[in-house]
């Protein structure tokens, strides 16, 4: 293993980029960049039946969108390739044969039914289910008999007895496993494909991976990988097992959990900002010193410290994500936010599919009204609902405001002035409201609240003159007329 920091993110193309996997990639990326090391992406694609056609490309595309840049992968071979497990058979096969020749592994011909029967018997006896070693010492005659029956063997690693496998985890501390609690495990499946724990240890060694940073659901895999390192006389990498991400019920974040969007692509489609997701995800199970919660990618690289990875589960707080994204939305120029919001306005049929320049200008004004409130670009649709409804239904508080004794006089003055107003723009509208104030003597909440309720149906909202401009003269006069 080299002295240089080399870490890897090893996704399977059986699915799209999940929040949990994105966090694994992020922490590996930040760790590598903090130590001026290499961030490697390796594709674990041996489960060909479950691989998605666009699974691999989607992973790369969404990582790039998040701002995660890799130093090595299928598109950047730095001499450690191939970077797809399916293309590394020439590396695995001699090592498999070596283990067979040294009697450190053996062929097992047991069927799935036989293995399940053994497992059930162990459970009935109150034992921990594990392979009992029935085919660990077959004679040549027995092997030939199984072959003649058409049985295809798997290959099992012969687990050493009375051995303790320990490692000092960067997050969890010292962790140990007793080999006597483990059965001989499969390193090559019946179809000839190496299993995860065998292949990953081989790959990490030959790619000179110095540190393995992953979720703590992989802790139980570690002793098997340590066995492979030990049996070949290789130095094991350092390990860091991150705490799991949990939902509001403090249950492990599951892809079947309908309460939380699970995939980066979903947030991307809604109009979340990549730098906001980068920021939010980095704070899932890791915390910087101090109270600040908004950092740039460059800041995170500078301050990232693996010692601050949390042992406790990371809570996925949807409200916190909305807040973080809103902080970034407020900093963006309106044109950027408008470009993100435009597809949502068109999809909701609030703008035509082929908008004119006038439509686009109106859309920009609409977005500028709500930019400081927006948690994500797609939120422009529910936020701006008041601009598009034909009928307004007032709540009790709104009805109380509009029933004020000063309202008829106020509405008469405002209606006549707005009807004659040209150009119908926010600055002129603001002047008009001030003129109404002077002429009627109505001021403060008595002035502004009835106007807002009359034109928007709401007690609160964006700047009133700007709102009136974006609503447009016809719609505003139509709504005011009810109270004249």
Swiss-Prot record:
One of its GO terms (biological process) is glutamyl-tRNA aminoacylation. Its main location: cytoplasm. GO terms for cellular component: cytosol. The keyword Cytoplasm applies. It comes from the Bacteria. A motif ('HIGH' region) lies at residues 11-21. A motif ('KMSKS' region) lies at residues 252-256. The keyword Cytoplasm applies. Keywords: Aminoacyl-tRNA synthetase, ATP-binding, Cytoplasm, Ligase, Nucleotide-binding, Protein biosynthesis. Pfam families: Anticodon_2, tRNA-synt_1c. It catalyses: tRNA(Glu) + L-glutamate + ATP = L-glutamyl-tRNA(Glu) + AMP + diphosphate. ATP binds at residue 255. Monomer. Belongs to the class-I aminoacyl-tRNA synthetase family. Glutamate--tRNA ligase type 1 subfamily. This is Glutamate--tRNA ligase. The gene is gltX.
């Amino acid at each position: 293993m080299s002295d240089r920091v080399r870490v890897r993110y090893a996704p399977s193309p059986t699915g799209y980029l999940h929040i949990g996997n994105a966090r694994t990639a992020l922490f590996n990326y930040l760790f590598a960049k903090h130590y001026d090391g290499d961030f490697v992406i390796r594709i674990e694609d041996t489960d060909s039946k479950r691989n998605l056609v666009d699974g691999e490309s989607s992973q790369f595309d969404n990582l790039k969108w998040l701002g995660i840049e890799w130093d090595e992968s299928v598109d950047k071979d730095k001499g450690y390739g191939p970077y797809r497990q399916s293309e590394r058979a020439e590396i695995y096969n001699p090592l498999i044969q070596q283990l067979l020749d040294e009697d450190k592994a053996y062929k097992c011909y047991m069927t799935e039914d036989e293995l399940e029967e053994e497992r059930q018997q162990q459970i009935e006896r109150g034992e921990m289910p594990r392979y009992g070693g029935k085919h660990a010492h077959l004679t040549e005659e027995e092997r030939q008999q199984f072959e003649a029956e058409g049985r295809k063997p798997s290959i099992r690693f012969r687990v050493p007895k009375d051995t303790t496998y320990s490692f000092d985890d960067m997050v969890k501390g010292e962790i140990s496993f007793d080999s006597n609690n483990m059965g001989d495990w499969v390193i090559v499946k019946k179809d000839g494909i190496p299993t995860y724990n065998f292949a990953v240890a081989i790959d990490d060694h030959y790619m000179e991976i110095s540190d393995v940073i992953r979720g703590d659901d992989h802790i139980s895999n570690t002793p098997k990988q340590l066995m492979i390192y030990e049996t070949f006389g290789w130095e094991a990498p350092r390990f860091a097992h991150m705490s799991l991400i949990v939902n509001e019920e403090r249950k492990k974040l599951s892809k079947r959990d309908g309460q939380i969007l699970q995939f980066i692509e979903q947030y991307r489609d809604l109009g979340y900002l990549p730098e906001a997701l980068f920021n939010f995800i980095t704070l899932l199970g890791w915390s910087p010193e101090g109270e600040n919660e908004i950092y740039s990618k460059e800041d995170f690289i500078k301050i990232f410290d693996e010692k601050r990875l949390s042992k406790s589960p990371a809570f996925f707080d949807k409200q916190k994500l909305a807040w973080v994204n809103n902080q970034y939305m407020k900093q963006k120029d309106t044109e950027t936010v408008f470009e993100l919001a435009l597809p949502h306005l068109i999809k909701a049929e609030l703008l035509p599919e082929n908008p004119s320049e006038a439509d686009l200008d109106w859309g920009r004004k609409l977005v500028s009204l709500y930019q400081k409130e927006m948690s994500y670009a797609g939120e422009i649709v529910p936020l701006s609902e008041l601009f598009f409804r034909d009928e307004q239904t007032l709540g009790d508080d709104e009805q109380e405001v509009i029933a004020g004794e000063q309202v008829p006089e106020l509405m008469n003055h405002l209606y006549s002035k707005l009807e004659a107003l040209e150009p119908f723009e926010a600055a002129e509208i603001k002047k008009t409201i001030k003129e109404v104030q002077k002429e009627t003597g109505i001021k403060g909440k008595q002035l502004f609240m009835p106007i807002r309720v009359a034109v928007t149906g709401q007690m609160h909202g964006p700047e009133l003159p700007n709102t009136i401009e974006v609503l447009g003269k016809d719609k505003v006069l139509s709504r005011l007329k009810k109270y004249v």
